[in-house]
């Protein structure tokens, strides 16, 4: 476009180039940045030469508008990816994500920088009246890269709006900048006469700011190495000078805020006159509206005024004197600092030498009491008081949202009081002989704290104990409320208030409390226990409640079933109602081995007085109470009270333990057996016999333990017996055989109660030794068999509530005789008669509810019957083996084996059985003795086979059944296999 020529509209694409010496209007440029942004190698796009003019140009992605010296453009709009390289003049450029590079000699006026746009003002370039709307999206003082305005040259009258940022590089200068809320100016170079209207100015190391005016919500931050001069801070403005920063000739107007520490340098004037912070010394500083002064270790501050919104932070080892605290002023300190001055109410306070006196901590204030130090008469009005041990002396007051945080063990021997609003006591441990006083309508929350005080006086409002252990009595006024939440444990009495126990909370009521526990309304989902440190005579405890709302909470009551009067802790419902469901857990506080049968209504555990009512189901028994021979159950009576009564039936352990005598003696008798149960081979040689027997044994229900009968039972047994002959000889026409045997066995029997319900199981592991003597008259065949046996029993009785173990010894003697008659050559009939006498001694023991003593047990048995069986010659003879060497020791088929069979019916009579089992103590009425009888008659049928399978080996099998026909005699069935080897 030649000089004097005008071109309207047009588009430059695909490396097109337009050289403008005249005037170009409305061009669209989409090419020119082939070598990247602001690269001198680019040759495309629109070039405005000396004297050339371009108006209303649109530069899109990849497009370049280059304005050389002497050229001028106006109203250019540059989109993302497009750029304007300026060495001439540009007016009213709009950067919609595009970039403007203002080179030396270039002047940009009225540029508007929108989101993601960037204006770079290089050394020797000038930008005036720029509006910056981008660059700070990453937050205050964040490095966002190439967005916003970067000044290496000069920027004049820049306006920085929300999200806008101006970065003044070390060689750059910004003059008369206005920064609004949400925008900021970052200064590494020079900033002159900046006005902060809600925006921020950051003066970095090496940067300077002069003449800054900080208006409402504006904030000037002078960082380490930064310098600010002649700053004016108006009402609600803020000047922050970091450690190592410098601000001089500051004018701090009323309501303006200074934020600094004694590691900075600040001088100027405030409403009190000249002030300074120089070389670790601060003087005459005013703190308000967010102002703050940190007095560091070893530094000092004098004549500090702390008004509403101001904060004075005196670090450990720092000193602040002549401090004047106004209403709303904040003090941060610990007991290692030295602070003195006046409170907002004009009263003097001090901190020093490990002693803090008369502190008043307003909202936001914080004081830390170190271990070994003392704080006297501290008032916390919404502030934070942290005690890392130490002692609270005088009256410590918490009001209006105050927090007292404990770590370690803190001692209070005086008064901790809450007068207004809410307060929180949390963590650590508060001990001593002091008291806690709660007044006012608010709530005091004690959380995660161990609190041990002389008393807690709940005069008004609510006390909430959360996840804490509190050991003290709570003395309350009616209309107040006490809440136990989380895993709180309260050890102390309560009198009187409305109490709520959450499901994980526990209230332990001691018998040495200063007052009796009385509660108005009790909402109960936790646990309540009566605790006692007394020894000697039992003294029942009482909890009195007007209204009880049970929410599956538990109350543990001590009961003395062995006492006729004054025998239980009580819950008293006084004039109100008991609703919901409360579980009563009963603790036997007496001799667990002793229990009396209750009389009348029973043992009272819930008493309804003054017209009180209790819902059906308001109380349930949480556990079985057993004492002596009795179970005790909870019952509601017509008077609305609740009682424990001994049940008519004995507890399940009575028949269970009584059956142990019978079970052990049954086993001994079965093991001993009789001669007809032993497999033998006539001859001159001794033999060894191995027998394995198992079976079922039990007793029918013949009235049960209440009628003196053996309890109903059913179970199994098994044993292995090894016996061997020691002597075989002939004496005066008689064959004499003597030997010994040993056995190991086990029995397991399920026992039933008198009502047919399961009582439990008795298991017995037994080991036995015995001897026998057998005499046979050779001429007549008359024989006699004598057996003596001893057994060690290890027994365990298991019920739903007990595992009871006992050991003992059983003995047995047996005399049996028989005379065989030959009916035919191979058939024999043998009448038999047997007498058995046995005894048992079991050790005494004790279960969870009583002692158990066993008297000596004994029984006598007579068996009469006969044996009918074959009587073949048991000589082994010759076999049919094809090998001569085996014909004397082997058979080819079963039919060649010598076999005898037999059957044995009998009648067994048991008589003179004895065996006492007693439970309880010697106290009158508590001891119960049971003597289950085993007397009775049973029918027994046994049958067996024996076969000789080798010259010296005989195998026998046997099965039998016993049926009780009268009394409590045993019944069952059995099976046995025997291996007999002669040698």
Q: Which residues does each predicted region cover?
A:
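Short secondary-structure subsegments characteristic of cysteine-rich extracellular domains
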Residues: 595-613, 706-726, 852-859
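Outer membrane beta-barrel translocator domains of Type V secretion systems
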Residues: 647-832, 837, 843-845, 960-980
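Extracellular beta-solenoid/beta-roll
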Residues: 9, 195, 267-270, 338-345, ...
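Intrinsically disordered, low-complexity Ser/Thr- and acidic-rich flexible linkers and loops
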Residues: 34-40, 137-145, 876-894
């Amino acid at each position: 476009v030649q000089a004097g020529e005008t071109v309207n509209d047009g588009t430059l694409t695909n490396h097109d180039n337009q050289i403008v010496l005249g005037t170009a209007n409305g061009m669209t440029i989409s090419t020119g940045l082939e070598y990247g942004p602001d690269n001198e190698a680019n040759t495309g796009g629109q070039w405005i030469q000396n004297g050339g003019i371009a108006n209303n140009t649109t530069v899109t992605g990849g497009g370049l508008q280059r304005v050389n010296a002497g050229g001028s453009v106006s109203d250019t709009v540059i989109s993302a990816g497009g750029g304007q390289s300026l060495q001439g003049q540009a007016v009213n450029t709009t950067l919609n994500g595009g970039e403007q590079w203002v080179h030396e000699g270039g002047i940009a006026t009225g540029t508007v920088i929108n989101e993601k746009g960037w204006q770079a003002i290089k050394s020797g370039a000038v930008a005036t009246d720029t509006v910056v709307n981008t660059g700070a999206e990453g937050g205050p003082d964040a490095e966002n890269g190439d967005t916003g305005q970067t000044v290496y040259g000069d920027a004049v009258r820049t306006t920085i709006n929300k999200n806008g940022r101006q970065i003044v590089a070390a060689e750059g200068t910004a003059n008369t900048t206005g920064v609004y809320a949400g925008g900021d100016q970052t200064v590494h170079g020079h900033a002159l006469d900046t006005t902060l209207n809600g925006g921020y100015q950051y003066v970095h190391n090496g940067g300077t700011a002069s003449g800054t005016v900080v208006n409402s919500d504006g904030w000037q931050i002078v960082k380490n190495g930064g310098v600010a001069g002649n700053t004016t801070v108006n009402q609600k403005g803020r000047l922050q000078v970091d450690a190592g920063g410098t601000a001089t000739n500051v004018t701090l107007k009323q309501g303006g805020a200074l934020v600094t520490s004694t590691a900075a340098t600040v001088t100027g004037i405030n409403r009190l006159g000249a002030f300074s912070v120089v070389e670790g010394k601060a003087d005459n500083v005013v703190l308000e509206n967010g102002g703050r002064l940190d007095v560091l270790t070893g530094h000092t501050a004098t004549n500090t005024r702390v008004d509403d919104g101001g904060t004075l932070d005196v670090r450990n080892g720092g000193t602040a004197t002549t401090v004047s605290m106004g209403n709303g002023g904040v003090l941060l300190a610990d007991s290692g600092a030295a602070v003195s001055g006046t409170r907002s109410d004009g009263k003097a306070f001090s901190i020093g030498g490990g002693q803090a006196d008369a502190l008043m901590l307003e909202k936001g204030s914080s004081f830390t009491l170190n271990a070994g130090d003392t704080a006297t008469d501290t008032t916390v009005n919404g502030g934070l008081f942290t005690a890392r041990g130490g002692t609270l002396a005088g009256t410590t007051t918490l009001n209006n949202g105050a927090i007292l945080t404990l770590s370690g063990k803190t001692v209070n021997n005086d008064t901790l009081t809450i007068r207004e609003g809410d307060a929180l006591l949390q963590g650590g441990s508060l001990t001593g002989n002091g008291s806690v006083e709660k007044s006012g309508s608010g709530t005091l929350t004690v959380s995660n704290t161990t609190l041990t005080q002389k008393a807690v006086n709940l005069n008004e409002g609510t006390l909430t104990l959360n996840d804490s252990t509190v050991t003290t009595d709570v003395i309350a006024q009616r209309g107040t409320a006490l809440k136990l939440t989380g895993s709180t444990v309260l050890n102390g009495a309560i009198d009187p208030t409305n109490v709520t126990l959450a499901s994980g909370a526990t209230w332990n009521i001691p018998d040495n409390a200063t007052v009796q526990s009385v509660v108005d309304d009790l909402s109960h989902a936790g646990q309540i226990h009566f605790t006692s440190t007394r020894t000697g005579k039992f003294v029942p405890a009482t909890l009195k409640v007007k209204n009880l709302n049970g929410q599956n909470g538990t109350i543990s009551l001590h009961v003395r079933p062995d006492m006729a009067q004054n025998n239980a802790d009580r819950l008293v419902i006084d004039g109100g109602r008991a609703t919901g469901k409360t579980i009563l857990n009963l603790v036997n506080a007496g001799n667990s081995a002793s229990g009396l049968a209750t009389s009348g209504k029973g043992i009272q555990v819930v008493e309804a007085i003054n017209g009180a009512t209790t819902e059906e189901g308001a109380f349930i028994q949480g556990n079985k109470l057993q004492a002596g021979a009795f179970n005790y159950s909870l019952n509601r009576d017509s008077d609305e009270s609740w009682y424990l009564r001994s049940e008519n039936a004995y507890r399940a352990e009575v028949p269970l333990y009584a059956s142990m005598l019978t079970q052990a003696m049954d086993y001994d008798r079965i093991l001993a057996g009789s001669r007809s149960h032993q497999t033998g081979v006539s001859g001159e040689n001794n033999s060894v016999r191995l027998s394995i027997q198992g079976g079922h044994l039990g007793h029918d229900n013949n009235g049960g333990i209440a009628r003196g009968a053996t309890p109903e039972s059913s179970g199994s047994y098994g044993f292995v017996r090894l016996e061997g002959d020691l002597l075989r000889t002939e004496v005066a026409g008689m064959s004499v055989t003597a030997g010994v045997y040993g056995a190991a066995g086990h029995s397991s029997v399920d026992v039933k109660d008198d009502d047919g319900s399961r009582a439990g199981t008795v298991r017995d592991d037994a080991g036995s030794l015995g001897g026998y003597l057998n005499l046979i008259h050779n001429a007549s065949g008359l024989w006699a068999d004598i057996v003596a046996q001893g057994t060690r029993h290890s027994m365990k009785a298991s019920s739903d509530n007990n595992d009871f173990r006992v050991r003992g010894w059983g003995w047995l003697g047996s005399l049996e005789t028989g005379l065989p008659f030959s009916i035919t050559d191979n058939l024999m009939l043998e009448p038999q008669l047997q007498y058995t006498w046995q005894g048992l001694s079991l050790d005494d023991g004790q279960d969870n509810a009583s002692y158990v003593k066993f008297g000596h047990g004994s029984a006598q048995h007579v068996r009469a019957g006969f044996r009918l069986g074959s009587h073949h010659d048991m000589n082994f003879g010759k076999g049919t083996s094809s090998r001569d060497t085996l014909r004397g020791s082997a058979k080819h088929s079963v039919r060649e084996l010598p076999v005898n069979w037999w059957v044995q019916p009998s009648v067994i009579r048991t008589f003179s059985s004895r065996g006492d089992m007693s439970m309880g103590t010697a106290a009158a009425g508590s001891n119960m003795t049971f003597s289950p009888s085993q007397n009775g008659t049973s029918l027994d049928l046994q049958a067996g086979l024996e076969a000789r399978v080798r010259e010296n080996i005989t195998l026998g099998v046997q099965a039998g059944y016993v049926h009780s026909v009268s009394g409590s005699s045993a019944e069952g069935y059995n099976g046995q296999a025997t291996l007999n080897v002669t040698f």
